[in-house]
């Protein structure tokens, strides 16, 4: 809501409120990048665990990543995208896989 300052005849401060539209926050794509070492089953687990995909959808995304080199896991606000990227990269590192997750503005 925008506010406009106005003074009345006694020089008292008055506020006029108007209707303004607030733009939605920018969305970010969370992406998985293909590598030659991470097992396909591990990628499916990541997609199910961190992106709430069922087995069929996770398999489709995994195959897309495998054949195209990159795949979209979802669209999120910046903070959520950053959190998911960090969680996936940490999970991959702990399990000694080079799977890389990244994000870019949609």
From Swiss-Prot:
Belongs to the ClpS family. Pfam families: ClpS. This is ATP-dependent Clp protease adapter protein ClpS. It comes from the Bacteria. Residues 1-10 have a biased composition (Basic and acidic residues). It comes from Xylella fastidiosa (strain 9a5c). Disulfide bonds: none annotated. Residues 1-22 are annotated as: Disordered. Involved in the modulation of the specificity of the ClpAP-mediated ATP-dependent protein degradation. GO terms for biological process: protein catabolic process; proteolysis. PANTHER family: ATP-DEPENDENT CLP PROTEASE ADAPTER PROTEIN CLPS, ATP-DEPENDENT CLP PROTEASE ADAPTER PROTEIN CLPS1, CHLOROPLASTIC. Binds to the N-terminal domain of the chaperone ClpA.
């Amino acid at each position: 809501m925008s506010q406009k300052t106005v003074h009345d005849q006694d020089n008292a401060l008055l506020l006029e409120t108007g209707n303004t539209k607030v733009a939605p926050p920018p969305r970010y794509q969370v992406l998985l990048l293909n590598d030659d070492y991470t097992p396909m089953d591990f990628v499916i687990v990541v997609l199910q665990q961190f992106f709430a995909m069922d087995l069929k959808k996770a398999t489709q995304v995994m195959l897309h990543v495998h054949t195209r080199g990159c795949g979209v896991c979802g669209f999120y606000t910046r903070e959520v995208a950053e959190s998911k990227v960090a969680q996936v990269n940490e999970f991959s590192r702990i399990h000694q896989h080079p799977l890389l997750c990244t994000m870019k503005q949609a």
